[in-house]
UniProtKB/Swiss-Prot annotation:
Annotated protein name in UniProt: Translation initiation factor IF-2
Basic and acidic residues: compositionally biased ranges: 194-212
Region (G4): 493-496
Ligand binding (GTP): 393-400, 439-443, 493-496
Pfam annotation, one family: IF2_N
Protein purpose: One of the essential components for the initiation of protein synthesis. Protects formylmethionyl-tRNA from spontaneous hydrolysis and promotes its binding to the 30S ribosomal subunits. Also involved in the hydrolysis of GTP during the formation of the 70S ribosomal complex.
Organism annotation: Geobacter metallireducens (strain ATCC 53774 / DSM 7210 / GS-15)
CDD domains: IF2_eIF5B, IF2_mtIF2_II, mtIF2_IVc
Length: 884
């Protein structure tokens, strides 16, 4: 037994899959899709010629046996008796509107009959009758002539009633109408509603003959039918009086005239209540509006309100108000502001300008603060949290040494110049209780970061060296702490030194209102030694005691909120930020927004490098998953909706761009006049690159403070990462210098800088960079030491030599390496070590130099932490006279 798929059978039958499936379901054959399998019996059922329902067959047999159609041409009066009277009336009624519907046949006399049949085919079944129309044309035309003598005009008036009463007769007469009874078919098929709709569409103002022939049927081919109807205007007009047309006798003209009057009467009756549509209405509207004069209108009050977000350009504002941009610029000049068409205007300025033209400005900027608001915490939801402690103090007073002593980790050895290079956050546990420490650099360049640290901290430990006393940076730290309302604990460090004078330190601090408890004050003083580990437990106990007094609490059961402590760009992990969670719990997978950046927490690590799945209040974690490097001090907010986080970040980015553009493009007439009077202002442009975001901001702020009346220092670009070719191109175009802090330029960038003559200055200590630029601006810069690049070597293998240490098996990539040259070890373009070379060998022989393309062994002086893939950069120091 063969099986056939539905789609195969549909292809053979030439029908669509859906159509065949519908037919199968109507036959009671269940199929799920076009891939369903059909049995042979089912195929035979479908392919068998369709048989109409039994009721219809009986009706057909009765109609055919009565031979109603064949009697009509012979006897005019008898057929109406055999056929239902209502059917005859409906047939007579339909003959009047029929000529308006369609006039497709070629013969003038046959066209009325065909016109009668077309609506009959169209109305009952919608689409199918259209297919059957051409088949009916010839027989209908011939037999309509025999039928027409029986039709009389008077019965046409009761048309609407008769048509509605004879709906069942219509359905029975449809099949007969195809063969022999066009009159009955016409009467049964059309439904009154569509017929009325067609007539209503016809414009009433046309001439009698055209209106009788050109209806607007609901069929898709209305336009073609209208054209054909117009062509056969003469013969179709008598179609309403088809009997006269059939006889061909002189009385036909009378019939035509009578039919015209009847049609006119009907149209007047139908068209009076109906609304005007189509071309007639359009022509009437055009005729009315053609004679009107153009009026100059004033916009409505609601249209005179312009909605803007934060700012708007002059051109856009002019466009919305419908005025010329030059008029707006003229108003701005009267207000003392030079502007172009692309000049951005803030809300206040735009409001003043719009008022000149009788417009109002409405600020529709998104309120991100409102979107990020959280419900206040209930007292029951608050739980105790660890204190956050910030260590502050002057340069080289021992802040990092003290913190390292507490953490029992000796990481101070690699610090350059005794200065902490970036903010760090650490978690320390003491007697089952945790304390979070923030380590801030002591140089004045980090004023902004220290202020941010004071905002997130609970307690400040102010480190003062017993042998040095109170210094300028110590005063700044005290001022920041007092401004933030943070309690201060004084740690007098280096008491193990012979020259230590802790009593003098206490006396100096009294000037700032910090009086020791021993002297009757309220400030806690602890004498410690980070080097000798003296009194460290006592210091931590004082911190915990102060925390108990403050009763620090937070709600861990909510979306996390915190602060960005530090951020950097890691080559392997992308943007990485240290986040201090202040309330709520941050989990892996949470969406967040921080400043102008958003993201999703992909991974978290604590200060020891261990992976963390959740971080509660007062816990610092390193978060991976930012879209960009955020700024230190940005508020970190966890959100449940990614779309919301992206929307807020996008809005903040746009706002930042508009603010920056407005800040750089503003220039008033007074400023322009001052510049002309003073002459050309000398600008010193600088590009700042550093290893972490906090250092970038600190260097940029310090450089901006160095601007004087003679020389203005502009930081045109600052970012995290190595110095690249893009930076060199920008410096070359802007006539700027490049300042690198703890980063190195890429090889191609170094070559381009030398070719373009761009001054690239590299520093390990921010203080040196600021002092050098300050001296250069003052003309006091001494002959400087310039670095001469020699070559680069890549470590491809690491060998451990007894009593010597690790030696790197290197390949010289470019230049040459000299034995007495200084070297720098780079890991991901970040300086890891800088010093001297202890050995340079080839095949167990000491050599003076190794050129490009050769391999050699290089040992570093007092340094063994070398890895495969590290770069050793060789250089020499030259003394060159400095030119301003």
């Amino acid at each position: 037994m063969s099986k056939t798929h539905v789609y195969e059978l549909a292809k053979k039958m030439g029908v669509e899959n859906k159509e065949l499936m519908a037919r199968l379901k109507s036959l009671g054959i269940e199929v799920k899709s076009h891939l369903s399998v059909l049995e042979d019996e089912d195929v035979q059922k479908v392919t068998a010629p369709p048989t109409p329902p039994k009721g219809v067959q009986q009706q057909e047999e009765v109609r055919v046996t009565t031979t109603v159609i064949r009697r009509r041409p012979k006897a005019v009066a008898q057929p109406p008796e055999e056929v239902a009277p209502a059917a005859v009336e409906s047939a007579v009624i339909e003959e009047a509107p029929a000529p308006r519907v369609e006039a497709v046949p070629e013969e003038p006399k046959a066209s009325p009959a065909f016109a009668e049949t077309v609506p009959a085919v169209e109305e009952p079944k919608g689409v199918e009758p259209k297919i059957g129309v051409p088949k009916v044309e010839t027989p209908v035309a011939s037999e309509s002539k025999a039928e027409e003598p029986r039709v009389t005009a008077p019965p046409a008036q009761p048309k609407p009633v008769a048509a509605e009463e004879e709906k069942p007769t219509m359905n029975r007469a449809r099949i007969l109408g195809r063969v022999e009874l066009p009159g009955l078919t016409t009467a049964s098929k059309p439904v009154p509603k569509p017929a009325e709709r067609r007539e209503v569409v016809i414009p009433p103002k046309r001439k009698m003959e055209e209106r009788a022939v050109t209806p607007q049927p609901a069929a898709p081919v209305a336009d073609d039918r209208k054209k054909k109807a117009k062509t056969f205007t003469e013969p179709e007009t008598p179609a309403g009086g088809a009997p006269g047309a059939k006889k061909g006798a002189p009385g036909g003209k009378k019939k035509e005239a009578f039919k015209k009057a009847e049609l006119l009467e009907k149209r007047e009756r139908i068209f009076e209540p109906g609304p005007k549509t189509g071309k007639g209405r359009r022509r009437e509207r055009e005729s009315v509006t053609f004679g009107k004069k153009t009026e100059i209108t004033v916009p409505k009050a609601i249209k005179r309100i312009i909605k803007i977000s934060e700012s708007i350009t002059v051109g856009e504002l002019a466009k919305r108000m419908g005025v010329k941009a030059t008029d707006l610029i003229r108003v701005l000049m009267k207000m003392g502001m030079m502007a172009t068409i692309n000049h951005p205007l803030d809300v206040d300025t735009a409001t003043l300008i719009a008022a000149e033209f009788s417009y109002e400005i409405e600020n529709v900027a998104i309120d991100t603060d409102e979107m990020l608001e959280s419900a206040p915490d209930t007292p029951e939801s608050l739980k105790k949290r660890p204190p956050v402690v910030t260590i502050m103090g002057h340069v080289d007073h021992g802040k990092t040494s003290l913190l390292d002593a507490i953490r029992e980790a000796n990481v101070i050895a690699g610090e350059a110049g005794g200065i902490t290079q970036h903010i760090g956050a650490y978690d320390v546990e003491l007697n089952g209780r945790k304390i979070t420490f923030l380590d801030t650099p002591g140089h004045e360049a980090f004023t902004a970061m220290r202020a941010r640290g004071a905002k997130v901290t609970d307690i400040v430990i102010l480190v003062v060296a017993a042998d040095d006393g109170v210094m300028p940076q110590t005063r700044e730290a005290i001022n920041h702490s007092k401004a933030a309302g943070v309690p201060i604990i004084i740690a007098i460090n280096k008491i193990d030194k012979p020259e230590a004078k802790p009593e003098r330190v206490k006396q100096e601090l009294m000037e700032f209102g910090l009086v020791s408890e021993e002297w009757g004050g309220e400030t806690i003083f602890v004498e410690v030694s980070a080097k000798k580990r003296i009194n460290l437990p006592e210091l931590l106990e004082m911190v915990l005691l102060q925390a108990d007094v403050m009763d620090l609490k937070a709600n861990p059961d909510k979306e996390a909120r915190g602060t960005i402590v530090e951020a950097k760009l890691d080559r392997g992990r992308g943007p990485v930020a240290t986040v201090l969670v202040q309330e709520g719990t941050l989990k892996v997978g949470d969406y967040f927004v921080a400043g102008v950046h958003s993201g999703r927490v992909r991974a978290m690590q604590n200060d020891r490098g261990d992976k963390v799945l959740a971080a509660g209040p007062s816990m610092p974690v390193e978060v991976i998953g930012f879209t960009g490097v955020p700024d230190a001090g940005d508020v970190f907010i966890s959100l449940s909706d990614e779309k919301k986080a992206k929307e807020i970040a996008s809005h903040r980015q746009q706002k930042l761009r508009e603010t920056e553009l407005a800040k750089h493009s503003k220039m008033s007439l007074e400023q322009l006049y001052d510049k002309i009077q003073k002459g050309e202002v000398k600008d010193l442009n600088a590009i700042v690159k550093a290893d972490v975001q906090g250092s970038v901001e600190a260097v940029s702020d310090s450089l901006r403070k160095l601007s004087t009346d003679a020389v203005r220092l502009n930081v045109i670009h600052s970012s995290v990462g190595a110095i690249t070719e893009t930076d060199v191109n920008l410096a070359s175009a802007s006539n700027a210098i490049i300042l690198g802090f703890n980063v190195r330029p890429e090889p191609k960038a170094s070559a381009m800088a030398e070719k373009e003559g761009v001054d690239v200055r590299l520093y390990n200590i921010i203080y040196d960079a600021v002092e050098d630029i300050k001296k250069a601006m003052e003309g006091l810069l001494e002959p400087t030491l310039r670095e001469k690049y020699l070559g680069r070597a890549e470590i491809r293998e690491v060998f451990s030599v007894p009593k010597v240490g690790n030696v790197g098996g290197c390949y010289i990539q470019d230049g040459k390496v000299l034995r007495n040259a200084s070297v720098r070890l780079l890991r991901d373009n970040v300086v890891v070590y800088e010093g001297k070379m202890s050995s340079l060998r080839r095949f167990k022989d000491d050599v003076k130099e190794v050129a490009t393309g050769y391999e050699c062994g290089i040992g570093l002086e007092n340094y063994n932490d070398i890895k495969v893939g590290d770069i050793i950069e060789a250089f020499e120091i030259e003394k060159i006279a400095t030119k301003l």
